[in-house]
Amino acid sequence: MSIFSHTFHTLSGESVALSQFQGQALLLFNSASQCGFTPQLTQFESIHEQYACQGLQIIGFPCNQFKNQEPGSNANIATFCTKNHGVSFLMSEKIEVNGPHAHPLWQELKSTKRGFLGTSAIKWNFTKFLIAPNGEVVLRAAPFTQPIKLIADIERVLHK
């Protein structure tokens, strides 16, 4: 299955097919509003502003599976992200990234690009995946990896 064959719903409930982004690079991550890594949202927005016109789509996937750090409704999440971090990139509705109810996209991401020591499970909020325009999952970055540290990888994928 291709990364671009998946769909998701935005925080407002709109269905989005990743196929519309085929030929563009994707930077996907799971998020939470009450996490120590939440300030990364501001960096993601800065990267979005700089690289969206070059073919990069950033999509955040709120998740409440790690210490209940995303307890709010989809509407609350949208307000928080916009008000506190100026988020204008796509954000999905709240999903699960691990377990039997994990979103199919995240199941594929985890099986395609394993984490530290070969584990597939997402260990914490703000795990990042960079996908090339051809659908190849290029890298998986740990939660503590600042988004700005991925710029060289993003540029390499965009200019292949």
Residue spans of the language-model regions?
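Chalcogenol-based redox active-site neighborhoods
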Residues: 1-160
